[in-house]
UniProtKB/Swiss-Prot annotation:
Name assigned to this protein: Protein TraK
Record flagged with keyword Transport: no
Compositionally biased spans, kind Pro residues: 81-92
InterPro entries: DUF5338 (IPR035225)
Keywords carried by this UniProt record: Plasmid
Originating species: Escherichia coli
Region (Disordered) location: 76-132
Length: 132
């Protein structure tokens, strides 16, 4: 007995979903080789060279544009861990003493205006000496 149209459609949809690429598979693949990419960039290799090698060896299957976006997002824009500020011991002053106020920076008494930007200014009324 032939299949009904809904059954045929259901099979087609299942087959189509299996073929549809997931957008995050390239992110997962990039994150797997992120440390290698970082090491190669630190060694001075160009991103294009790194991508070409990883594409030829099968480590990445994404386009170069996608690769550069992932490098920008996950390597270059990654927050760099900054060292914490040096901690001062809390018992450095006696408990009864008031902390000394910090001296305010000396204020300049004469505030100078920023220099005007030079350039072309248009005057709609011509000068007679310019016309002759």
């Amino acid at each position: 007995m032939p299949k009904t149209y809904p059954e045929e459609l259901a099979e087609w949809v299942k087959g189509r979903e299996a073929k549809k690429p997931r957008q995050d598979k390239h992110v997962v693949a990039f994150l797997a080789v992120k440390s290698d990419v970082q090491a190669a960039l630190d060694a001075g290799y160009a991103m294009k060279t790194i991508w070409e090698h990883m594409k030829e060896t099968g480590r990445l299957r994404c386009r170069y544009e996608t690769f550069t976006q992932h490098v920008k997002r996950y390597i270059k824009a990654a927050p760099v861990a900054s060292p914490p500020p040096p901690a001062t011991p809390p018992d450095s002053q006696p408990k009864g003493a008031k902390p000394e106020p910090k001296a305010a920076p000396p204020a300049s008494e004469s505030k100078s205006e920023p220099p005007k930007i030079g350039g072309f200014t248009f005057d709609a009324t011509p000068k007679k000496e310019d016309l002759l």
